[in-house]
Amino acid sequence: MRLRNFVMSTTLVSFGFISANASAWLLEDELKHRMETRLTNSGTGTTTVPPLPAAPSALVRNDRILNEAYYDTYRILSGDNACSQFFGGSPKATVVLSSLMGSVQKEYLEGSVGMRMSGEITTVNDAPTQTKYRLFKNVAINAKGPFYRKRSSSTEMTIPRLGSYEPNTKAIRAFILLHELGHLMKGDDGNWLLPDDGKSEALSRDNSAKIENVCGDQIKNLSRSN
């Protein structure tokens, strides 16, 4: 995504009130219950539902939009579908998603940016799933970009769509996370599922089109859920 300019940046997020933390735990429990219910009802007959993981960071636990986006995307990757298969299957895909989300911070970037990964790269080997992937030191969600807003400010024009998805929707949030996930994992051929797009608009569009092609049906279903 054009959203991945390689620059160094950091953000500190603090949570100062016990009441806020208590509310966050209730939020997480509520969303996990909703996701487990949807997974149970998604098939026919009796379905064994694996427990959803705890939020991978305090930020994901406390931020309602980010929390919901994480569990929406986790739910997509937990299913047996074209999207999860593209990422090597559910066990691998969900492990890397949770690791990615554990690194996320919120920053105020230029309005068209959705998510940005930058800095030192670490290679990770997850033994239980035999998954090898990479992580960037800095992973930023733009607090005034399409993940959270339709406009970056009251005086600016509407933030443009990414692919087929309107800004500040459940669909675009999952789309952004899945796009970034594609830059962290390799396919069976040894190449990154999505090559680094950096500042290349053409490559960014190609990468976005690939995610929409393989995950579009699952992303579309998010708009039908409450």
Map each language-model feature to its residues.
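Bacterial N-terminal signal peptides that target proteins for export
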Residues: 1-10
